[in-house]
């Protein structure tokens, strides 16, 4: 997390600049556009603190539909080197989602997490998020607007400032009278 140059961020009413970074990081999971991996085994990457049993790890990988692939491609199952799997970008994102499932936090940040995946992988990710992260706060940074329609609230930024806040469906119903409606129309492909 970066230090703020202005303003403040409150989580549950607490100014995070007054809290130890370790405490903040332990309560936030993030999945970025590129995902984060270390050299080592599948297990090292999904459970870096080595606190989960094999069944829990396999369950998380099954939920994101990667367990079979890891069993097929990995020479030693969870002990296989992560690099020998040659995961696609979408599979890497699903793996990161399995890691978040295995290590739940109060807040899940998705920073362009679906921007480099195909439509099928995006659908899997959205389904897993809907079914498994309902009790968490989810903050999604996205240009693929379809991925945020299930959210309770969207915040539209313009030039680094909040331009609009609201329910995505209510904002879309107002059409181009809203920033979100205009953005939606602008980003939709032309009809043939």
Predicted regions and their residues:
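ATP-binding/catalytic-site motifs of ATP-hydrolyzing domains
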Residues: 8-10, 14, 161
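ABC-fold ATPase nucleotide-binding domain signature/coupling loops
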Residues: 10, 67-95, 106, 117, ...
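ABC ATPase nucleotide-binding domain helical subdomain, centered on the C-loop/LSGGQ "ABC signature"
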Residues: 10, 18, 25, 43-83, ...
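C-terminal portion of ABC ATPase nucleotide-binding domains
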Residues: 64, 71-73, 127, 144, ...
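Hydrophobic anchor residue at the start of the ABC signature
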Residues: 97, 125, 141
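A short, proline-enriched helix->beta-strand linker immediately N-terminal to the Walker B motif
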Residues: 102-106, 135
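Catalytic Walker B motif of ABC-type/P-loop ATPase nucleotide-binding domains
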Residues: 108-112
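Conserved catalytic loops of ABC-family nucleotide-binding domains
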Residues: 130-140, 148
């Amino acid at each position: 997390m970066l230090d703020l140059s202005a303003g403040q961020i409150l989580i549950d009413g607490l100014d995070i600049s007054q809290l130890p970074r370790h405490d903040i990081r332990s309560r936030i999971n993030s999945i970025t556009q590129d995902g984060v991996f270390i050299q080592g085994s599948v297990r090292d990457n999904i459970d870096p603190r080595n606190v989960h049993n094999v069944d829990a790890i396999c369950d998380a990988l099954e939920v994101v539909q990667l367990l079979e692939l890891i069993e097929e491609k990995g020479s030693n199952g969870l002990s296989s080197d992560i690099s020998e799997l040659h995961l696609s970008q979408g599979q890497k994102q699903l793996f990161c989602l399995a890691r978040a499932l295995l290590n739940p936090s109060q807040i899940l940040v998705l920073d362009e997490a679906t921007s480099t995946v195909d439509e099928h992988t995006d659908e899997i990710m959205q389904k897993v998020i809907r079914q498994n992260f309902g009790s968490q706060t989810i903050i999604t940074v996205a240009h693929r607007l379809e991925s945020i329609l299930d959210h309770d609230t969207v915040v539209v930024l313009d030039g680094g400032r909040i331009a609009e806040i609201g329910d995505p469906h209510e904002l879309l119903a107002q059409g181009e009278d809203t920033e979100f409606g205009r953005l939606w129309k602008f980003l939709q492909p032309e009809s043939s």
